[in-house]
Curated annotation (Swiss-Prot):
GO terms for molecular function: NAD binding; NADH dehydrogenase (ubiquinone) activity; NADH:ubiquinone reductase (non-electrogenic) activity; quinone binding. GO terms for cellular component: NADH dehydrogenase complex; plasma membrane. NDH-1 is composed of 13 different subunits. Subunits NuoB, CD, E, F, and G constitute the peripheral sector of the complex. It comes from Aquifex aeolicus (strain VF5). It is a peripheral membrane protein. It is found in: Cell inner membrane. This is NADH-quinone oxidoreductase subunit C/D 1. Residues 217-593 are annotated as: NADH dehydrogenase I subunit D. Residues 1-193 are annotated as: NADH dehydrogenase I subunit C. Its main location: membrane. Keywords: Cell inner membrane, Cell membrane, Membrane, Multifunctional enzyme, NAD, Quinone, Translocase, Transport, Ubiquinone. In the N-terminal section; belongs to the complex I 30 kDa subunit family. In the C-terminal section; belongs to the complex I 49 kDa subunit family.
Amino acid sequence: MPWAKEGDLQELLKAFPQASVVELQNSTSVIVPKDILIDVLKYLKEKLGYKLFLDHSVVDLKDLLENEKEFNKVVKQNLIAFPEDRESRFQAFYILYNVDERKRVIVKTRTNGKLPTIEKLWFAGKWAERECYDMFGIEYEGHENLVRAFMWDTYPYFPLRKDFPLEGIPEQELPSLNEVVFGDNLEGLMNYDRMHTRVPTLEDLEVTEKKRLKKKAQIVLNWGPLHPGTHGTMWFLFDLEGERIVQTDVILGQLHRGVEKLAEHEMYNQFLVYTDRMDYLSALCSNQAWVVAIERLMGIHDKVPPKAKYIRTMMSELQRINSHLLWLGTYALDLGALTIFLYAFKEREKIMDIIEGITGARLTISYPRIGGVRMDLPEGALEVIKAFIKKFPEELKDWETILTRNRIWLRRNKEVGIISKEDAYFHGVTGPVIRGSGIPYDIRKFEPYDAYDEVEFDIPVGEIGDCYDRYLVRIEEMKQSIRIIEQCVAKLEKMSKNEPFFYEGEGKKLKLSLDGIGVKAPVGEIYSSGENPRGELGFYVVSTGGTSPYRVKIRPPSYYNLCIYPHLMKDRYVADAVTILASIDPVVGETDR
């Protein structure tokens, strides 16, 4: 596990005697008072090389502070910073990464509702702080524009606080779902209550729009939230001088479903289906990242049978190609290359058929399980996969012939949307976006999971970080995915049909426990991540020993990759808006959660 050790942080401890280091099985934390938080974060970034910002949020300790037994249980495991402080309701955490040394660290502090902003250290932190303000009501001193991230600005509540009910607060009367406009009212089995949670009005949305917009020019162009070029319910406001974009504002939340709130009320295996519905274009990869996180929390990841690990790795790489094919087809279509769209979707349909034949589903799949996979590969599955990976490289080569040296393609992509290495760290981008900037950051190599430490593959990187580099990186990633799948198929062909595909545990009761009453994960915390087609999908999980997590913070790669978009659009033309957005490749189900 790539966690920093206390010995790696001695220089920090000498510079800040008030700080302390806590090493746990699945994390290393630096505990600091709030008044030196910014100084410690700056020291970690500038002196110790922790330049990549991964995530920031808070944990609401209200339920623990009100339950002495539960509180002492987590204090015993060193999960709480400054446990003697019973007044500060929230524990804030910041997750940073040192790419050069491949080490990760968490910085923790306590607060009762106010924190200093980190926006001058990392722009990505600015978006993370908006989310914390939106969900928990945390106020950030010095924040340039502290507005809500997902909810509309007149919404009066903070949904991720422990005292906010899962079903919301019913305060608005709306027609019952049993009532119809025409014909007889339905005599349904359920009599739905007319009182519902608050919904935004047009006036609420106008207030939200005005709070986002910092008008600097004469023309404002609305792009979205329902535009074919955004490929999802994303809303952009462009401030224009002629066709030149002076500044860009992003309004998210149209697809916000409260996934992290739901996680606190579902058992660990039950939450698996919600990971399908975040990045719905790469559900298998999201499933895999979640089950690996919980396996590591439970201490059973090394006990998962090799067959299950190779199956999960193979299926995730098929899903990666699937996702990149959809990206390539729609990207080319947006720029006028209709032929590539047709070719890419023809091959993607073959992968969809393979996935459906193995798992029974095409989009929302939930095939992996904590401890393995739901079922073994059906007979003939490997033969179909071998047939696909034998022909696919030839198809990919033909597309490269059409696109890679095409003069129009070059003009639309070369030196457009350049992301330097410094900007990549500053904005917390990951996946093909950071690799396009020449930084070889790939979780499959840096923190291998499942069978990734058993297979050989390369990490493609770009040179200058423009849209063209990001295109080349994704094309090469599909080739590397084929390499990985070939090795997985070769291993699986040698395995007996009777080899286990699920870790049974003591007394062979784990699977029954997980699918039935739910397994109890031990008291602890973990940050674990997987390499999704869009970047690092991370899960920060706090467990108090129950069948459901106390807190789940999801690090969505699309959310942080998208935060660099306004920077890339400055002084560009409207025609570049689609190109740059498509090169980032966000999925709105993941940004909004």
